[in-house]
Amino acid sequence: MPAHNFPTTPIARLTGHNGPVHAVTFSAGTGQYILTGAQDRKVRLFNPATQRLIQTYSAHGYEVLDLAVSEDNARFTSVGGDKTVFLWDVPTAQTLRRFTGHAARVNTCAFGGEGDSVLVSGSYDGTVRVWDAKSRSERPIMTFSEAKDSVSAVCVRGHEVFAGSVDGRVRVYDLAMGVVEVDVLGASVTSVVPTRAGDSYLVSTLDSSLRLMDRPSGKCLQTFRHDEFGNETYRVRSTLGMADSVAISGGEDGSVFVWDVLSGKLLHRLWHKEDGDQGGGGRNSKKDVVSAVAWNQLRKQWASAGGDGEVVVWGVGD
């Protein structure tokens, strides 16, 4: 599926959240379902094909800032203002575990290890913590404190943990070798996503830029910018799609930008809002920010989560 066949048609609008949606992810495998986390302290499970709300998960006392789903779709983890990492059972909507220890809000989470046996979290307290999802211990099995500011993004690939921080650095922890590598971006990091090959990663920073970074050398392979693309205030999560041939990111004005990875050229600018304009607040209004995007490789669909409380699912039109 070449980049010029990128899906640009809104095929579903998922509503129900009362406040900005901060996190969106497809279920594992076929990606039949979508999980969302929002300012209203709720996690919701939707079937985008029917636009039906299937389940609401209520345990957070503060905003939900990130989500991750296990490979078997039986569990998911959520984090936010509670300073706690929640591990959920999907069918029963009950929490299996609650990991406490962070000193401030938890911004980001991921599964890792064989059989998704560990959880990784990053916090405003500047630490990355690794938790044993299988044991009953409440204490983290590892804590990394190298960041000089809030940890905004974590992801796991094999035995490596990628951690992006407001201090302008991406740190890659090799858990097998016991070493850390540091790439200096300069501007505050809001999002980190490794490529499928693992030899590079996409990073978003608060200078209205995305960059594709070479994993071994730390060199910038490609920069993605546009005169109309603004991201200087709010945390925006970007992603790669179409077999890593496109970079996708929301902006602070209610639109989504799609770049060709090889050339760095802008392919599409799409409006998250139905009326196709900036809405009430203009740029830098929380209501207009498209804070997260997610790609579904099998279905050739993707989703955008907005400050307007809606999630838009995009596909190929008839």
Explain the meaning of each model-derived region:
Residues 103-183:
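Solenoidal tandem-repeat scaffolds enriched in leucines and small polar residues
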Residues 1-25, 30-33, 37:
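Intrinsically disordered, low-complexity acidic/Ser/Thr/Pro-rich linker and tail segments
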Residues 291-318:
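Blade-level signature of beta-propeller repeat domains, shared across WD40, Kelch, NHL, RCC1
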Residues 36-40, 72, 78-82, 121-125, ...:
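Conserved strand-to-loop turn within each blade of WD40 beta-propeller repeats
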Residues 24-31, 67-73, 79, 110-117, ...:
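Loop/turn segments within WD40 beta-propeller blades
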Residues 9-11, 52-55, 94-97, 138-142, ...:
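A structural motif specific to WD40 beta-propellers
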Residues 14-21, 57-64, 99-106, 144-151, ...:
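WD40/WD-repeat beta-propeller blade N-cap
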Residues 24, 43-46, 85-89, 109, ...:
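WD40-repeat beta-propellers
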